[in-house]
Curated annotation (Swiss-Prot):
This is Ethylene-responsive transcription factor ERF107. Its main location: nucleus. Residues 74-92, 191-201 have a biased composition (Low complexity). The gene is ERF107. Keywords: Activator, DNA-binding, Ethylene signaling pathway, Nucleus, Transcription, Transcription regulation. It is found in: Nucleus. One of its GO terms (biological process) is positive regulation of DNA-templated transcription. Residues 106-164 bind DNA. InterPro entries: AP2/ERF_dom, AP2/ERF_dom_sf, DNA-bd_dom_sf, ERF_plant. Belongs to the AP2/ERF transcription factor family. ERF subfamily. It comes from the Eukaryota. Probably acts as a transcriptional activator. Binds to the GCC-box pathogenesis-related promoter element. May be involved in the regulation of gene expression by stress factors and by components of stress signal transduction pathways.
Length: 201
């Protein structure tokens, strides 16, 4: 049985919840309801067909028949879906398989050039963050090692490195990509440059 406190608590909750739903008395009197429109709307509906009674022995209530029908539908849908595949779907799936995304790791201080080489640089805190060029490398790992070497020399143990376990183990990597140098172009024989000065009288 409920105690007085429990029932009063329930009454307070009920009053709080349903108080907003109370309909004022004037609302019902002012509300105009046209029953003729409602009744004429009912007559325009189609006649109601009740659901026929099923006998317990009917196949509709037999669970085994349901299982067999479901299995038949699944077999039909799988055979029809395999024969009606569109070429557009196949080409899209083939494109996805043929596209191969290279997963490359982004190393600190390394940028990839559009032509495929890797540039390494570091900012020098002593010179207001100006960049120090470390070189251009064939692989991103070589460029990252160059950055690590320079960072370790500049900042010491506080340096944030790409390969922290290799700190101080390697020498400075050699810049594998060199700038193009001009080769001395031989000049045609008709033009000579004289280095000797001619004496004039």
């Amino acid at each position: 049985m409920e105690t007085f406190e429990e029932s009063s608590d329930l009454d307070v909750i009920q009053k709080h919840l349903f108080e907003d739903l109370m309909i004022p008395d004037g609302f019902i009197e002012d509300f105009v309801f046209d029953d003729t429109a409602f009744v004429s709307g009912l007559w325009s509906l189609e006649p109601f067909n009740p659901v026929p009674k099923l006998e317990p022995s009917s196949p509709v209530l037999d669970p085994d028949s349901y299982v067999q029908e479901i299995l038949q539908m699944e077999a039909e849908s799988s055979s029809s879906s395999s024969t009606t595949t569109s070429p557009e779907v196949e080409t899209v799936s083939n494109r996805k398989k043929t596209k191969r995304f290279e997963e490359t790791r982004h190393y600190r201080g390394v940028r990839r050039r559009p032509w495929g080489k890797f540039a390494a640089e570091i900012r020098d805190p002593a010179k207001k963050g100006s960049r120090i060029w470390l070189g251009t490398f064939e692989s991103d790992i070589d460029a990252a090692r160059a950055y690590d070497y320079a960072a370790f020399k500049l900042r010491g143990r506080k340096a944030v490195l790409n390969f922290p376990l290799d700190a101080g183990k390697y020498d400075a990597p050699v810049n594998s990509c060199r700038k193009r140098r001009r080769t001395d172009v031989p000049q045609p024989q008709g033009t000579t440059t004289s280095t000797s000065s001619s004496s004039s009288n």
